[in-house]
Amino acid sequence: MENSTTTTTTTTVTQPDESYQRTKWIETKKNIKQLLQQLTPSNIKQTVLQLFQINLLRYQGLFIREIMKQQIRITTNAELYGSLISIINSKIPEIGELLINRLVLQFKKNYLQNNKNLINSSIIFICQLINQQVLNEILILQILQMLLESNVPNNNNNNNNNNIELAIMVLKQTGSYLFKHSNTALIMILNRLKDILQDGANANANGGNGGVGLSSWNRKSIEYILKLARNDFKNISIIKNGLDLVETEDKETHVITLEDKLYSRDHLNVFSVDEEYLDHENEYIELKKEILGETDHEDENENEIQVIETTKNYEEKITDMSQSELLQYQKTVYLTIMSSMSSDEAVHKLLKLNFKSKIKNKTKNKTKTKTNSNDNEILADMVIKCCSQEKTYSKYYGIIGEKLISRNDHWHNLFIKLFKYYYDIIENFETNSLRNLGKFFGHLFASDKLALDQAWSNIKLTEQDTNPAKRILLKFIFQEMIEELGINEVKERLINDDYLKPYIKGIFPVINVDGKDADAIRFSINFFTAIGLGVLTEEMRYVLDNLSEPEEEDDRGRSRSRSYSRSASSSSYNSRSRSYSRSQSRSSRSPNPRGRQRFKTKKHNHNESRTPSRENLKRKRSESVTDRNGNNNNNNNNNLQDLLNNLK
């Protein structure tokens, strides 16, 4: 036999040397600066495409530093830069998060140093990021609370007037957004401004000895803001036309507060040699292909970013998946859920899988297709189906649903829609699946991610409107809520919240009832007693005892019934100012009014805290005038602090 020798050749990839990397760094720095200087509303889409050609992960420090410098130089471009960041953040959230961290740190530093220009620049940029839903509104509410505190560190008229001036600027920038998303907190802020206006008038009348005097400019500005609020900020748009370029389901919102420990990562601003330069470049090339939907044979002009096309300029074409594609997609979602080690990993993989599906459909159809909502609904539905097929319920699925809902309103509305769908067809499921579904949705309700006023508004707990399967589902939902929250918290949320009562009267019929509703009340009482939750029926029993039979109703009975109705209505009205909506913080989205508070509004936010307030928000004008020690102001600040804690 002949001996054969085999020689193996190993190919070593030579990494670019320091000189090459440094030259590339300098060129990229100049390129980023030039692109940002030439940015206009008309070329923002082309600029985004050019920026994505740059490795934004490698050069994120340069990019963020340059955009902050440009915004300081030209503060009027804040809306334009906010729109640009919103697009990039929807694809690379790390960049949006780093920018927010640096802006908050810049604000804190310059607020202590009283550097007015940098304070204004930071605040304006932060406000625009909130309007674009890159940043949650909790941060700006905390800043407003800090600015309007009665006990400022330096009780100086100039400092106080500067703080008020800054607060007015914030409300001009974000008032319309806060009116829509955090109405309860906004009302507190407006009430505080009214107190400041009254105290300032008294101080000026007393020659400055009665308190902090208001400058004429601030007095007029406060009156202007209050006038805007009375008109529901109707004439102020949240985002200018042409700059709302990211679809709701694609927005990434960061939750950052003043108390968070933040890092500016300044080392990203300076050059350093990358020992794995080519590997990192190849990783970004793959990411860029996902973002832009590139193929080897597509012309650059065909590379569009899905999120930067508005839905208002053309008619959308709806394209559904074929049956085979749908089955394959569902199978992939199932395998992804089953193979993940944690809920965080599962959500990350599912969203990445969903994004690839959108890019594939877009490339295939060559046109803008309305597949985003369809893909998201299929994904959410598969999470629910996977949960229902388990032998025993696992909170793993509940946390996946919780994290998806927390992303934005789009996902919240999808799960509300799916809950109503499964409630209507629940009789098709076996008992084991019923238990899993009940515990899954019970977890979402207990965690405050699904708004009860939207999910339960159509449920009627009567013998005619329910069947055994629906009642079993409701039983498991309530049992899961009791297990996670405790009976006292569930009672506080469901029974003692006057705002919620009109929306869940089909389950707890205690308002606007008469003798005709006696059977429905008895059925509900019997249901909750049978499942061991009789403590939730106390108010219903009281209502039932005070109802008079329709056929035996005389004048005295009618008078008593009307009196009870008026009493219940009055109680509900008076308690509204003490009870916030229990909708989730970025997350529950109930647009229904909370009733009259001290400041009249017509529309209310669906993003309010669902925890009841501890004290009445109404404060008499006379108390504000006579209380020179600022007790009312402190109470208002405490109320706002409680609300901010609940939002977090």
Swiss-Prot record:
GO molecular function annotation: RNA binding
UniProt key word NADP: no
InterPro entries found in the cross-reference section: ARM-type_fold (IPR016024), CWC22_splicing_factor (IPR050781), Initiation_fac_eIF4g_MI (IPR003891), MIF4G-like_typ-3 (IPR003890)
Pfam families documented for this protein: MA3
Broad class of the protein's primary localization: cytoplasm
Subcellular location: Cytoplasm; Nucleus
Compositionally biased intervals (Basic and acidic residues): 606-626
GO BP, one annotated term: mRNA splicing, via spliceosome
UniProt keyword terms in alphabetical order: Cytoplasm, mRNA processing, mRNA splicing, Nucleus, Spliceosome
Region entry Disordered, spans: 548-648
Biased composition (Low complexity): 562-594, 629-648
Domain MI span(s) in chain numbering: 328-460
Keyword Nucleus assigned: yes
Family under the similarity heading: Belongs to the CWC22 family.
Full protein name: Pre-mRNA-splicing factor CWC22
Naturally occurring in which organism (per UniProt): Candida albicans (strain SC5314 / ATCC MYA-2876) (Yeast)
